[in-house]
Amino acid sequence: MSKAYEQSGVNIHAGYEAVERMSSHVKRTMRKEVIGGLGGFGATFDLSQLNMTAPVLVSGTDGVGTKLKLAIDYGKHDSIGIDAVAMCVNDILTTGAEPLYFLDYIATNKVVPEVIEQIVKGISDACVETNTALIGGETAEMGEMYHEGEYDVAGFAVGAVEKDDYVDGSEVKEGQVVIGLASSGIHSNGYSLVRKLINESGIDLASNFDNRPFIDVFLEPTKLYVKPVLALKKEVSIKAMNHITGGGFYENIPRALPAGYAARIDTTSFPTPKIFDWLQQQGNIDTNEMYNIFNMGIGYTVIVDEKDASRALKILAEQNVEAYQIGHIVKNESTAIELLGV
């Protein structure tokens, strides 16, 4: 075989090895609706087996952002795969959709099979937890596009929901309750600022913070909310949901509210992880701005009728999710979110 391609910076054999290494991880994620296996030009999924009357497909795509830089610098690659899945499936979950399948895209300076395997293992772990088939993907070696050791990861998720069960916020009314589901930490947003503060502080990321190495705190993967929220949806009528990502409370909570309504949030009603206090102090950041950047301890919200709030909290507790009644819906023509206690 000609070495011309390899001399241009593309190692075909490393790509083959990466595929071989990832195959066992991918197989763990398969669902009965998946038709065929890996290696085809297009991945296929049989919707007729879902037993839905009028399925609506919901799709989403996202990446992990500059959190990748920390993972690359410290050689911790598996948790990044979890982040890639979580950012996508949590987004489509806000419509009430059950995630069905996921595709990944990994672009890198040079294919290192061991690193690709770690990333795909994390992706597969998250797919197994959320019953999402890893149905396809692409690994691209682009030496001229990335510095040595660098890579980027993006994901694409597709789910389905019965048309009559689609959650779009149109039933939000005054007096309904906002329930917040605890985050696992910073999740995958705000890392350009996080990395800046890390560099300015000069901290040793191997040193401990709150009984854990700093690096483990910063790379804690985004929490997956699929199982608990779908369990809740079976028992309680959910009026709206939000995934608290980039833009924090201020940008994300209003996205599911009809015009003329606001979520009045009591910021003293839930605990804020200590890492946010560290970031705020290190950067001398205004509290309002913190809520405009980070999740501040709440990674996902659901809005339910007041009569269903206690039951919803009980169901979430049974799903081993920390959840809090953090606010309620009010009429407000001028703003869609009111934060109390900041």
Swiss-Prot record:
Belongs to the AIR synthase family. Keywords: ATP-binding, Cytoplasm, Ligase, Nucleotide-binding, Purine biosynthesis. Pathway: Purine metabolism; IMP biosynthesis via de novo pathway; 5-amino-1-(5-phospho-D-ribosyl)imidazole from N(2)-formyl-N(1)-(5-phospho-D-ribosyl)glycinamide: step 2/2. The keyword Ligase applies. GO terms for cellular component: cytosol. It comes from Staphylococcus aureus (strain JH9). One of its GO terms (biological process) is adenine biosynthetic process. This is Phosphoribosylformylglycinamidine cyclo-ligase. One of its GO terms (molecular function) is phosphoribosylamine-glycine ligase activity. It is an enzyme of class 6 (ligase). InterPro entries: PurM-like_C_dom, PurM-like_C_sf, PurM-like_N, PurM-like_N_sf, PurM_cligase. Its EC number is 6.3.3.1. It catalyses: 2-formamido-N(1)-(5-O-phospho-beta-D-ribosyl)acetamidine + ATP = 5-amino-1-(5-phospho-beta-D-ribosyl)imidazole + ADP + phosphate + H(+). The gene is purM. It comes from the Bacteria. It is found in: Cytoplasm.
